[in-house]
């Protein structure tokens, strides 16, 4: 009797030792990745005198948020026009691709962080509305000779109305929100949409509130990317999905050279001609080059707690869509 008990105890101790070693290895890998990410971001992890990048400049951390705010305050009224001019309209296809990968179902709640002028939220509401209409058409086709029970159920569902999808646009910049609200009014979007002034690093929402979280062309402007990712994880419901559309590292060397030439020589000029603001668009170009590449950003998302993290390169890696789930 003693021998089996002794064998059982030894096995438990052995398993516990292996688990401890596994945790220590994971922790070591995490710290190594964090050190690499910190170095890439260009600021110290010490608590005093921390600095970060603002484009190619090195600035104190507390100054970056203010500088970024002023950039978007300056470009807000011409932001959408400049997006079309800079990308030759391709940004619309990138955003449509984000929605198709996301494939949101009717009735879900979206947090569109750094949502600015509402592009992603408008697409989300239109997509879920179209999805609901398609589901209704398929349902009607499958009921060519409905029973009285089906007819009664149809009347009940009509009274209840379609499931209401909701999008919350959260942006730290009030000028961007003002432009977005005007766009929504002009487009006749009156339901399912709300606007909140808030910081991606300290979201003004309770835990487990949203089914989906998107941030499009915004996370590279955040001072502490890890903190923004942790906030995304916090406000998502279990099973919720994180999606980020952001400029990334071009994978083709020839395209990379052409892209660099276009970015640095043409985009600031367009900014001056269209928006009367060279410096803001010079910063935007530089901020793209300072953002982590696809693999490093994927690791950052995993470190925030997300699972099944993957990314999709678009237009040769000029932009990438990262996706992850909160389990």
UniProtKB/Swiss-Prot annotation:
Protein name, as recorded: 2-methoxy-6-polyprenyl-1,4-benzoquinol methylase, mitochondrial
InterPro entries tied to this protein: SAM-dependent_MTases_sf, UbiE/COQ5_MeTrFase, UbiE/COQ5_MeTrFase_CS
Gene3D superfamilies named among the record's database cross-references: Vaccinia Virus protein VP39
Chain residues that bind S-adenosyl-L-methionine: 117, 171, 199-200
Lineage: Eukaryota, Metazoa, Chordata, Craniata, Vertebrata
GN (gene name): coq5
EC number: 2.1.1.201
Protein's cellular compartments: Mitochondrion inner membrane
Recorded superkingdom: Eukaryota
Organism: Danio rerio
GO molecular function, one term: 2-methoxy-6-polyprenyl-1,4-benzoquinol methyltransferase activity
Swiss-Prot/TrEMBL keywords: Membrane, Methyltransferase, Mitochondrion, Mitochondrion inner membrane, S-adenosyl-L-methionine, Transferase, Transit peptide, Ubiquinone biosynthesis
